[in-house]
């Protein structure tokens, strides 16, 4: 059955999916799509539509072969179903692959033959991620492994701590990506005001993996204790740096516009909008090497967990 440019394959296999990619490119008149990577998305059925839409938007900056993988019930006979095609706003190729039965335990055997040759592989878990992404059979196929502790259906703080403890080069979390703009503003503030910071605080919703990472990053950079305060949100609402000359602060109450305050200078507005997942995903796909600052931050956060010295 064909819907637009998407072809549905029932009880199929990797070879048939790969052949359908070739046919889809031919129908589109684009034998070479100029794709730069493979993006694998491991997603539950109820998150699949939103995750694939986010990847579609990100594909305009990073043309890719996008493989959505839905791991279904692992009981019973193995079955692979897929929707394959191009177009529909995609800058590349896409397949949404549903696995059932025994093959769920060996999803990498379906995905591996579909990876673009001689190109990087990124994998994204939009909801619950494995405790150790680099050791996961699908995660082991990728150079970049993207999780999102804030989107987990389990405890968000625990999920972030678990990702910190199992960090491996190539891992990242969208909780970190969400604070890129905060970190840039704070770094700029410290450049403008070359004074010693003697204390700091980060205010955010009580459960906020991003705030925990930001507080840890600040403590690592400034070598001061950073107080983690609770607010009603949304997200991170304020960062304060204490200096002998006075406070340097960035306050954002509406999730869109912040106020930057510093000693002996008038307050000024700063754009600091909470970004959507497609923009966060696109940012992470720009770099496929190890993020050493993230690595240092998560190791420091992991070391602060109860039971660690």
Question: Which residues make up each language-model segment?
Answer:
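Short N-terminal or domain-adjacent regulatory/targeting segments
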Residues: 1-33, 173-190, 287-309
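An N-terminal, globular interaction/scaffold subdomain
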Residues: 1-119
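Structural alpha-beta junctions
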Residues: 57-68, 115-121, 140-146, 219-228
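A generic structural motif
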Residues: 65-74, 124-126, 148-152, 225-236
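Extended, compositionally simple fibrous regions characteristic of intermediate-filament-like scaffolds
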Residues: 88, 168-177, 270-273, 293
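Internal, hydrophobic cores of structured domains that mediate oligomerization or house catalytic pockets
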Residues: 93-187
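A contiguous, surface-oriented mixed alpha/beta subdomain in the mid-to-C-terminal portion of proteins
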Residues: 157-247
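Long, compositionally biased intrinsically disordered terminal regions
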Residues: 222-223, 235-237, 244-309
């Amino acid at each position: 059955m064909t819907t637009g440019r998407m072809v549905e394959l029932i009880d199929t296999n990797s070879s048939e999916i790969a052949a359908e990619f070739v046919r889809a490119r031919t129908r589109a008149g684009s034998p070479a799509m100029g794709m730069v990577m493979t993006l694998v998305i491991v997603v539950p059925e109820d998150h699949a539509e939103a995750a694939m839409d986010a990847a579609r938007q990100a594909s305009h900056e990073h043309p890719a072969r996008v493989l959505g993988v839905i791991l279904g019930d692992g009981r019973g006979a193995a079955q692979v179903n897929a929707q394959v095609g191009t177009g529909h706003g995609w800058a590349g190729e896409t397949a949404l692959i549903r696995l059932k039965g025994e093959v769920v335990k060996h999803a990498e055997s379906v995905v591996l033959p579909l990876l673009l040759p001689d190109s990087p592989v990124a994998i994204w878990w939009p909801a619950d991620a494995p405790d150790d992404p680099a050791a996961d059979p699908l995660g082991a196929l990728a150079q970049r492994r993207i999780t999102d502790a804030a989107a987990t259906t389990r405890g968000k703080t625990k999920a972030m701590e678990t990702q910190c403890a199992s960090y491996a080069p190539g891992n990242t979390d969208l909780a970190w990506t969400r604070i890129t703009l905060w970190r840039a503003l704070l770094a700029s503030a410290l450049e403008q005001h070359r004074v010693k910071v003697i204390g700091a605080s980060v205010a955010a919703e009580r459960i906020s993996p991003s705030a925990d990472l930001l507080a840890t990053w600040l403590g690592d950079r400034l070598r001061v204790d950073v107080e983690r305060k609770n607010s009603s949100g949304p997200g991170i609402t304020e960062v304060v740096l204490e200096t002998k000359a006075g406070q340097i602060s960035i306050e954002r109450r509406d999730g869109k516009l912040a106020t930057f305050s510093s000693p002996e200078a008038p307050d000024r507005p700063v754009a600091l909008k909470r970004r959507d997942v497609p923009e966060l995903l696109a940012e992470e796909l720009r770099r496929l090497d190890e993020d050493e600052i993230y690595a240092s931050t998560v190791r420091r956060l992991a070391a602060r967990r109860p039971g660690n010295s």
